[in-house]
Design a protein with these regions (language model features):
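Low-complexity, Ser/Thr/Pro-rich intrinsically disordered linker/stalk segments at domain junctions
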Residues: 24-138
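Sec-dependent N-terminal signal peptides of Gram-positive bacterial secreted proteins and lipoproteins
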Residues: 2-25
């Protein structure tokens, strides 16, 4: 009877240990120190016009200026080529470009490449980039 209880106790300890290890392995670490999010939207009409915007936020008391750089890119000749670039800078901790429209050609893949820069005054604290793939435009 004592051996049975000891085996049960050991089994419970092993299960609890596995649960603790699993829980600690599932902790999500932040990708950036200051930047919280990068957002964008890209839609292409049947007539071949890309409508897009990009933005992001860095909600930290250390951040007082944010700059967003949005590149519309086309996959051509086995590489991403930038068709146009838009930039917006804002005081505070968030920035967003206005909605832009740009003509694109059928038969290529497109994406937005968005970079967000967080500043304290003129000192760059952090820069992060995020691609958003639209896919192939027939």
């Amino acid at each position: 009877m004592i051996k049975k209880k000891a085996k049960s106790a050991v089994s419970i300890v092993i299960v609890l240990t596995l649960l603790v290890v699993s829980a600690s392995a599932a902790v999500i670490q932040p990708r950036w120190t200051y930047i919280a999010s990068i957002v964008c939207s890209l839609d292409i009409s049947d007539s071949g016009y890309a409508t897009l915007y990009g933005g992001g936020s860095a909600p930290s008391p250390d951040v007082n200026k944010v700059k967003v750089i949005v590149k519309l890119q086309q996959f051509k000749n086995s590489k991403w080529e930038t068709l146009n670039t838009w930039t917006a800078t804002a005081s505070g901790w968030s920035a967003r470009t206005s909605t832009k429209t740009w003509p694109v050609a059928h038969g290529y893949s497109y994406r937005l490449y968005v970079t967000l820069e967080a500043y304290n005054g003129n000192t760059l604290l952090e820069s992060a980039s995020q691609p958003y793939n639209y896919g192939f435009f027939q």
